[in-house]
Amino acid sequence: MAVQTLDDLLNAGVEGRAVLVRSDLNVPLDGDRITDPGRIIASAPTLKALAEAGAKVIVTAHLGRPEGEPDPQYSLAPVAAKLAEVLGRNVQLAGDVVGQDALARAEGLTDGDVLLLENIRFDPRETSKDEAERTKLAKALVELVGDDGAFVSDGFGVVHRAQASVYEVAKLLPHYAGTLVDAEIKVLGKLTAEPERPYAVVLGGSKVSDKLAVIEALAPKVDTLVIGGGMYYTFLAAQGLSVGNSLCEESMIDTCKALLEQYADVIHIPQDVVIADSFSADAESKIVSVLEIPDGWMGLDIGPQSVRRFAAILTSAKTVFWNGPMGVFEFEKFAAGTKGVAEAIIEATGKGAYSVVGGGDSAAAVRQLGLPEDGFSHISTGGGASLEYLEGKELPGIAVLEG
């Protein structure tokens, strides 16, 4: 069954109706300062459209990983302030999730008002393994919008989780995909259906174990699989080479060896790396061949030769998916690999390639390195969700919208 979208809901009419929206507002904070408001900005179009159409908008979202109880450091207060700024309208913040304050504020809403509930993960039922407990929370959320309410799923970053505000609540209300979720489904569908070739995938990040499923799913389907980041050193160890103090998953060495043998024509790995004598922004660093990593040193970025080789592959591709940085881009000394690969993808996009940045650290790197976001065809808001989609897994939050 086709997923109903926000347009379907707006066409049906929302004036005077309460609409519960599950947004992804899980932004990085430094104290109470938001360091990257990307997800808030991406969530705004759905909320704005509903408010302007006269809906009483009730937003639920999480921030960080609180332990199922209120924790001031994970309060959505800074998010509410930023959301109000982005929407250009007042955003109320409830003092609880589904308690007395949330109920009172929900009942007092007028057409076009926006209410943000406090961090949904302050309630242990949100992430409970017990479906009955999750359903109780979902029913409490439904009580806030009433019998005439609707549910809009717009948090793509959480659709791979069977959680109360993502899955159970969609079973209890007429449900729709928000602008963001609808766009993500279409974009990732384009990558899985018939991607234009050559199709290149760039995977980085720290652990092979985190990316193994997507490597195994994509390696048989793509023309080129570029591997960098911390996980690369396990592949290096699989070739019998010394990695010094670099990150290495001993338990994954045999797996990496098998992948390199099976997909020798597909997998491309760095030939040179930037190494450091310690994990710090001002560490002593040098560029070496991957054959020459000395004891006591660690690889923190791919080297310039590898950047040039990967750039040649990427600029000739017609479809590119990128997930995971090439190095520790947070440290300026070790950001060149990530920046170089990103710039090659931007160049490919300028030549007509279809490029998708798979959320998470990659999206953060684009913003932190000052790269133009519109240089890519699409920047996903869901790292884990986009990977699981490409692995071919069923995403509970999408499956329930189809029901």
Curated annotation (Swiss-Prot):
Monomer. It is found in: Cytoplasm. It catalyses: (2R)-3-phosphoglycerate + ATP = (2R)-3-phospho-glyceroyl phosphate + ADP. GO terms for molecular function: ADP binding; ATP binding; phosphoglycerate kinase activity. GO terms for cellular component: cytosol. It is an enzyme of class 2 (transferase). Belongs to the phosphoglycerate kinase family. This is Phosphoglycerate kinase. Its EC number is 2.7.2.3. GO terms for biological process: gluconeogenesis; glycolytic process.
